[in-house]
Amino acid sequence: MTLSIIVAHDKQRVIGYQNQLPWHLPNDLKHVKQLTTGNTLVMGRKTFNSIGKPLPNRRNVVLTNQASFHHEGVDVINSLDEIKELSGHVFIFGGQTLFEAMIDQVDDMYITVIDGKFQGDTFFPPYTFENWEVESSVEGQLDEKNTIPHTFLHLVRRKGK
């Protein structure tokens, strides 16, 4: 299994505000779709509820401690240990609590860095480049629908870190 994080955060590591993305960036949504289609997404219940439905053409797995949680098209797990039992390419999709729990266990991270500062109430955990090697860094294209400067980073964990 390959275990990755996929996330977008601003310069202050904001990832959300009131259970929504604080920005609208279609390029990032397209990037996420390209990377995750055909693979597995693991997300917390609050993240799933903010999306409202399973993302198509992916296995959607929701981690929750609520025994009553059920949703068509979603597999439910109740512990972090169950993530290790998944196969294929598994993307940790959020939110904050799941990122905090998994950042030290993932092989790599796909991060869209939003070049701005947004109001937020959820954050991506701190990370340093001494633990991560930049595999790629691509500036996002700006146009009438994508007006916020952004960079797509792929970071790979350094050996022994």
UniProtKB/Swiss-Prot annotation:
Domain DHFR: 2-157
Enzyme Commission number(s): 1.5.1.3
Reactions that this protein is recorded to catalyse: (6S)-5,6,7,8-tetrahydrofolate + NADP(+) = 7,8-dihydrofolate + NADPH + H(+)
Keywords noted in UniProt: NADP, One-carbon metabolism, Oxidoreductase
Binding site for NADP(+): 7-8, 15-20, 44-47, 63-66, 93-98
Family statement: Belongs to the dihydrofolate reductase family.
Protein name according to UniProt: Dihydrofolate reductase
Name of the coding gene: folA
